[in-house]
Amino acid sequence: MTQLLQVYPKHKVLEIGTGCGYQTAILSILSKRVITFEVLSALSTKSLKRLKRLGYDNVDFHCADGKYGCVEEAPYDRILVSAAPISIPDELIKQLAPNGCMVIPVGSLYDQFIHIISKDKNGQVHIKKSTPVRFVPLV
């Protein structure tokens, strides 16, 4: 998913689903700034402590439901979602910057595919359905 996202040093990245923080650390190395959301309090706290201890200082942690993104910090050059909604959330597309890219698993529990959503410089949205996957639901 990270490779599909094509993150560069100038990018501001929204990550939904911090998890253990592994993906967050990779995004932190590749980008200028990461805004990450984790809905599970214990997981969020552990990830925050771990990544701060390791010196990842360009990450803003939020223990909250990130399924609607974070309008206050938008627009984002890249958005990575690590849980699967039934359909692509319009709220996230609206927060994608021109020339931005979002990688997100989409579908029901047993019928999910990675989707690569790009927005061109004019704001036109393009959606490409990719690899079959299985992620936890984005609730």
Give short role names for the model-derived ranges.
Residues T2-L4:
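SAM-dependent Rossmann-like transferase core, predominantly class I methyltransferases
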Residues Q6-N122, H126:
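Conserved nucleotide-cofactor-binding alpha/beta core module
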Residues H126-F135:
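Conserved histidine-centered catalytic loops in small-molecule metabolism enzymes
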Residues P137-V139:
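C-terminal substrate-binding/catalytic core of Rossmann-like NAD(P)-dependent dehydrogenases/reductases
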